[in-house]
Amino acid sequence: TSQPDCSVGCDTSYCPDTSSCNCGTFADYCKCCQYCNACAGKTCNMIAGQSCEDGYLCRPPEGYSYIDVVTGRISSLCLRI
């Protein structure tokens, strides 16, 4: 997959509502929309590059690998850096 084409402009009408984000937000690749961070200890989408709240990183739980996440064996979690 290729990176999105950010030169086409930004239509914020397609952006999600982030008013109920409990753990902050992060900007998409083109810096157009904001998305909710996943909270500490909660599942996150490591494959899609979902961010976690400050001080945490979306990764496989201890004892598991990225392959375990990709194959659906386990979900990634927001774990302390």
Curated annotation (Swiss-Prot):
InterPro entries: Growth_fac_rcpt_cys_sf. The keyword Amino-acid biosynthesis does not apply. Hemolymph; Hemocyte. SUPFAM superfamilies: Growth factor receptor domain (SSF57184). Keywords: Hemolymph clotting. GO terms for biological process: hemolymph coagulation. Multimeric. This is 8.6 kDa transglutaminase substrate. It comes from Tachypleus tridentatus.
